[in-house]
Amino acid sequence: MPQQSQLWLIRHAPVGGPPGMIPGIDAHADVSDAAALLRLREQLPARHAAISSPARRARETAVALGLLVSSDPAFGEQDFGDWTGRTHEEIRRGSEAVYDEFWRAPASNRPPGGESFVEQIARVRGVIEALPSGDVIIVAHAGTIRATLALALELSPERALRFAIDPLSLTRLGRLDNAWRSGRGGSS
């Protein structure tokens, strides 16, 4: 009997702070948009497993959606190391050469003290491949969702970085054994 899975990938609610800031693990989610949360909740399957990033913003979003989640560090955002908690403007002002070098190859380059997007994909790979069959809701980050898309759609890391993943957006992926397909919201 083939193994079927549906992944329901949700990006956490918006985070406060200055525009362009790279939030830390303890940044709060703004879960005040009750209408958006309700629209999203109505699209989710009733029976499911649910997992979130350990970041506060992902856990707060899961609670606001009424999900009982376990937390898995593999679903955490890309580690931006020394750049976490700072705006892009501050980072560039502090070290323009390092910042510019990072953006020449953002998929493979590492921020100082952090991890590359390629390394994030490797981190996500193990947990995605081990997910149970059935519906699995994952509340995570734009980078985590892009990493999952890279794996499922067999995209290069550079191409996966082209996806825009908005706060409170839903990305759906289906898997039959090891074959993936993509979808947007709704039910299958």
Predicted regions: what is each one?
Residues 52-53, 122, 139-140:
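Short beta-strand scaffold positions
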Residues 2-70, 94:
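Active-site-proximal alpha-helix that buttresses catalytic centers in soluble enzyme cores
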Residues 156-181:
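Domain-level recognition of soluble alpha/beta enzyme cores
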Residues 16, 57-59, 77, 144-147:
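Short, active-site-adjacent cap segments at secondary-structure transitions
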Residues 28, 65-123, 184:
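Phosphate-handling substructures
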Residues 38-42, 121, 125-133:
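Generic structural signal for well-ordered alpha-helical scaffold segments
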